[in-house]
């Protein structure tokens, strides 16, 4: 169902997560993975900027899977931020057209994380509609396979959806009433038994039930987790919700990871964007570095008029005007200082006469 492109080795050397020009001191035992289509390169770049700031020395490599729509300039910028970019082909045969429209094909790249355990002690997957707000040191200890129960604040009713939300119709052997597991943040850790067999189980599930799947990656991983809960409970762990917190949750203010799953993202909804100015600052930095911008529509833009959301549409001008104002202020202060010095010199010359 999915496979890495022939020139994209699944477990090869990847560029260390470090400041540009800094030579890594050792081979890392940790890997951060992302998957991005070309039109979402801005989201990956913004995420990496936050990851770097809050985790300046995480001892992790970064691997960004991408489709053939990634611009060379964006790829170069992602690599300058410490990532290795690898092409990934996702076969969506058998899925409904509406499911293909709903999902990012690169979300299927997360299944490759099972086999990446052959080269790393821990592998972390992050969807790109995420804000990193704090250190991720604690997340690496989760596992052997860890994923979070969907944040109940997402529904607005204080309840978690059932796993049935991932399906167009029931699938035998899958409990649709079980709490839905969100797969936007996942951890794989060495000690997980037969990881490649688990990957194959997920891919076989996609192949067997494709037309029934609304959110294919999440459907397959929920089915896998239900099987593991019965057959291998020691291999399955619940990821603490603070590592997969929805923006609607009051806990999002302090959560290390905020995940804007659902229709409203940090870049297409003014209300959501206004709540996370840190994401906007990083997004503006990405563009200042030469990265591509979000090109789609924005809902609820009025919430941000004149406020934080203005950064998304006009931060370049704002920064430029601020720099000009600071320059003018410095020049005025210098002129005032020169004038004051002249006045002081004049007073000193007049002092003996007074």
Where are these regions (language model features)?
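A glycosyltransferase accessory/donor-loop signature
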Residues: 2-36, 46, 64, 190, ...
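Short, charged/polar "capping" segments at the starts of alpha-helices
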Residues: 68-74
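Conserved catalytic core of nucleotide-sugar-dependent glycosyltransferases
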Residues: 141-204
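Short, acidic, metal-binding catalytic loop of nucleotide-sugar glycosyltransferases
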Residues: 50-58
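GT-A fold catalytic core of metal-dependent nucleotide-sugar glycosyltransferases
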Residues: 87-91, 108-159, 187
């Amino acid at each position: 169902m999915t496979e890495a492109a022939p020139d994209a080795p699944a477990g090869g050397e990847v560029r260390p997560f470090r400041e540009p020009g800094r030579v890594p001191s050792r081979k890392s035992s940790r890997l951060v993975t992302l998957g991005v289509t070309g039109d979402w390169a801005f989201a990956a770049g913004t995420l990496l900027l936050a990851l770097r700031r809050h985790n300046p020395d995480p001892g992790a490599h970064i691997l960004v899977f991408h489709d053939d729509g990634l611009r060379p300039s964006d790829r170069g910028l992602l690599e300058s931020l410490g990532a290795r970019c690898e092409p990934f082909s996702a076969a969506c045969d058998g899925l409904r057209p509406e499911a293909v429209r709903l999902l990012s094909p690169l979300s299927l790249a997360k299944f490759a994380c099972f086999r990446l355990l052959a080269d790393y002690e821990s592998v972390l997957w992050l969807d790109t509609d995420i804000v990193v707000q704090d250190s991720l040191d604690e997340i690496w200890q989760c596992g052997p396979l860890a994923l979070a129960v969907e944040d109940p604040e997402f529904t607005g009713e204080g309840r978690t959806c059932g796993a049935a939300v991932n399906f167009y119709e029931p699938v035998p052997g899958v409990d649709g009433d079980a709490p839905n597991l969100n797969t936007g943040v996942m951890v794989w850790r060495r000690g997980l038994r037969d990881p490649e067999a688990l990957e194959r189980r997920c891919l076989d599930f996609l192949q067997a039930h494709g037309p029934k799947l609304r959110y294919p990656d999440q459907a397959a991983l929920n089915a896998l987790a239900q099987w593991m809960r019965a057959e291998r409970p020691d291999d399955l762990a619940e990821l603490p919700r603070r590592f997969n917190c929805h923006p609607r949750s009051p806990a999002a203010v302090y959560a290390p990871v905020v995940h804007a799953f659902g229709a409203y993202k940090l870049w297409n909804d003014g209300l959501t964007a206004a709540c996370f100015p840190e994401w906007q600052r990083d997004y503006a930095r990405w563009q200042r570095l030469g990265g591509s911008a979000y090109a789609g529509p924005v809902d609820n833009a009025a919430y941000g008029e004149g406020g934080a959301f203005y950064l998304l549409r006009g931060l370049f001008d704002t920064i430029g005007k601020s720099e000009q104002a600071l320059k003018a202020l410095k020049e005025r202060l210098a002129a005032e200082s020169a004038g004051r010095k002249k006045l002081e010199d004049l007073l000193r010359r007049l002092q003996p006469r007074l």
